[in-house]
């Protein structure tokens, strides 16, 4: 009997449709609740910027005492705000190095459960910051929720990738990004002044992140652990068999279990690499460079600058209701993530990434032109909105969801944990740089700031075109062959791969 974890060809050569069980749906939904929180905390800090800055001003004045200045120095306020935004990424940078250790020690499911302690604590601190008259507490809360998000950014794709059926591997993997953008959109809507973006309710707006954390704590115990973790890492055949049965809906999972046994045998022959060994390995240097550059192409594209400071950008463009325009960008973000879900297994990772980079570069140039002409041509404010919407749409077609797919597929089991740590650290470091530095760069460059991103996007496009292989439909042996300078393997007939190969071993390097 075919298992839900295999892709067994039918008589006409077409792969069969595999069952999507209720357990699989519950497990994926429960996992991506973490990604929803990740996105929420990216977007939530934008809309209430003015009222939070007013709170910072009141706190600062209260500490000066009578006879002090009548307002906080602008430089101090800018620094406090930039730190409030960027400390989120510092937490992510630090925790991203712990993904491999925690996922191996606790398992995928229990690691996600334990991670919610950071979410609850961070949300509580942010919610209490105003009452405590302490911007330090808010910044600490942002740090903790960033640490939560750093772990989530690795744990969720790992878990979903290991439980996904083959024919849905790409689509279910992209749901991680979809949950992130939905979280951003929810934060933007709730951040409106007519909702929670007021001087009295903004602490509640920041604290709401506790709710999906509690929901995940409630649902995850009913979900199975990754069968790959149970058998290959923990050597627990009975629990792995039970997990496979729940996920696939089949009574006989012997084929899937045999697949796990074969993978375990290969893993025993492949030496895991430490971080230092990976960095010093000539064999893995090229795929590691590709993995890092693709992460840079995501974060240095300018997308986080748009979401962190979108309200300010729309105000600069002369939009009368910038908060609503920001929500419009969030809707576009969500819609085009759905488009990526539909296209990722059809068009290919490399093609979508190139399309996204090219489109974002064009929109960045258009945005610059619109901002420069705004004073002479007021209608340019509408052009700037179109440019931002297009910028967001092209991001979600390619640079948003694609880089993590490539990282997972470029490396076999031995170097993969270290490679994901390097890629994750690169991603979060750039996130921090943009969050901390964009406001200063924007003040210095004015309307020309997005030309800087256009130049970077062009460079990433050229690199992707010249160096990044297409990985869709190819086995890890074929992908690895491109880095051994034997491209002839890529011309061979592509054999079906399985979702367990998504994070499984391929060869003994």
Curated annotation (Swiss-Prot):
Keywords: Cell membrane, Cytoplasm, Glycoprotein, Lipoprotein, Membrane, Palmitate, Phosphoprotein, Sugar transport, Transmembrane, Transmembrane helix, Transport, Ubl conjugation. It is found in: Cell membrane; Endomembrane system; Cytoplasm, Perinuclear region. Expressed in skeletal and cardiac muscles. Expressed in brown and white adipose tissues. The gene is Slc2a4. The chain crosses the membrane at residues 25-45, 82-102, 112-132, 143-163, 172-192, 202-222, 288-308, 324-344, 354-374, 385-405, 418-438, 446-466. GO terms for cellular component: cell surface; clathrin-coated pit; clathrin-coated vesicle; cytoplasm; cytoplasmic vesicle membrane; cytosol; endomembrane system; endosome. Residues 46-81, 133-142, 193-201, 309-323, 375-384, 439-445 are extracellular. This is Solute carrier family 2, facilitated glucose transporter member 4. D-glucose binds at residues 177, 298-299, 304, 333, 396, 404. Binds to DAXX. Interacts via its N-terminus with SRFBP1. Interacts with NDUFA9. Interacts with TRARG1; the interaction is required for proper SLC2A4 recycling after insulin stimulation. A lipid is attached at residue 223 (S-palmitoyl cysteine). Residues 7-13 are annotated as: Interaction with SRFBP1. Insulin-regulated facilitative glucose transporter, which plays a key role in removal of glucose from circulation. Response to insulin is regulated by its intracellular localization: in the absence of insulin, it is efficiently retained intracellularly within storage compartments in muscle and fat cells. Upon insulin stimulation, translocates from these compartments to the cell surface where it transports glucose from the extracellular milieu into the cell. It catalyses: D-glucose(out) = D-glucose(in). One of its GO terms (molecular function) is D-glucose uniporter activity. The dileucine internalization motif is critical for intracellular sequestration. The keyword Transmembrane applies. It is linked to It is a candidate for certain post-receptor defects in non-insulin-dependent diabetes mellitus. Sumoylated. Palmitoylated. Palmitoylation by ZDHHC7 controls the insulin-dependent translocation of GLUT4 to the plasma membrane. Residues 1-24, 103-111, 164-171, 223-287, 345-353, 406-417, 467-509 are cytoplasmic. Insulin-stimulated phosphorylation of TBC1D4 is required for GLUT4 translocation. One of its GO terms (biological process) is cellular response to osmotic stress.
């Amino acid at each position: 009997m075919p298992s839900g974890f295999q892709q067994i060809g039918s008589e006409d050569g077409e792969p069969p449709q595999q069952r999507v069980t209720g357990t699989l749906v519950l497990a994926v939904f429960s996992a991506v609740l973490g990604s929803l929180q990740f996105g929420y905390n990216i977007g939530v800090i934008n809309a209430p910027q003015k009222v939070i800055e007013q709170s910072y001003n009141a706190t600062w004045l209260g500490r000066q005492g009578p006879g002090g200045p009548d307002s906080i120095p602008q430089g101090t306020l800018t620094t406090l705000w930039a730190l409030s935004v960027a400390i989120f990424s510092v937490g992510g940078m630090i925790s991203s190095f712990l993904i491999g250790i925690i996922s191996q020690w606790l398992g995928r499911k229990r690691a996600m459960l334990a991670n919610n302690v950071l979410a609850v604590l961070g949300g509580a601190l942010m919610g209490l910051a105003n009452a405590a008259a302490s911007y330090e507490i808010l910044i600490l809360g942002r740090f903790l929720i960033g640490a939560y998000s750093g772990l989530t950014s690795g744990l969720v794709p790992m878990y979903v990738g290991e439980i996904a059926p083959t024919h849905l591997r790409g689509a279910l993997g992209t749901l991680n990004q979809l949950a992130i953008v939905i979280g951003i959109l929810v934060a933007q809507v709730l951040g409106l002044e007519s909702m929670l973006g007021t001087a009295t309710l903004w602490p509640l707006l920041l604290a709401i992140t506790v709710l999906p954390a509690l929901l995940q704590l409630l649902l995850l115990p009913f979900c199975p652990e990754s069968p790959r973790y149970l058998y290959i890492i923990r050597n627990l055949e009975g629990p792995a068999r039970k997990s496979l049965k729940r996920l696939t809906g089949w009574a006989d999972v012997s084929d899937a279990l045999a697949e796990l046994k074969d993978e375990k045998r290969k893993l025993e022959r492949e030496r895991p690499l430490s971080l230092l060994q990976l960095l010093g390995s000539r064999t893995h240097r090229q795929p590691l460079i590709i993995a890092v550059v693709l992460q840079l192409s995501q974060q240095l594209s300018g997308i986080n600058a748009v979401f962190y400071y979108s309200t300010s950008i729309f105000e600069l463009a002369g939009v009368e209701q910038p908060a609503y325009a920001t929500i419009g960008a969030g809707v576009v973000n969500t819609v085009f993530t759905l488009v990526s879900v539909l296209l990722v297994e059809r068009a290919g990772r490399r093609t979508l990434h190139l399309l996204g980079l090219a489109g974002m570069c064009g929109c960045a140039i258009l945005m610059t032109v619109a901002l420069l002409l705004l004073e002479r041509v007021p209608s340019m404010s509408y052009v700037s909105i179109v440019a931002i919407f297009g910028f967001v749409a092209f991001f979600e077609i390619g640079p948003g969801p694609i880089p993590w797919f490539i990282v997972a597929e470029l490396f076999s089991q031995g170097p993969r944990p270290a490679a994901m740590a390097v890629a994750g650290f690169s991603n979060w470091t750039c996130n921090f740089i943009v969050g901390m530095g964009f406001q200063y760069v924007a003040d210095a460059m004015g309307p020309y700031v997005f030309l800087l991103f256009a130049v970077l996007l062009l460079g990433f496009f050229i690199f992707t075109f010249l160096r990044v292989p297409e990985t869709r439909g190819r086995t890890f042996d074929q992908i690895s062959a491109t880095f051994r300078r034997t491209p002839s393997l890529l011309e061979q007939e592509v054999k079906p791969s399985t979702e367990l190969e998504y994070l499984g071993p391929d060869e003994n390097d």
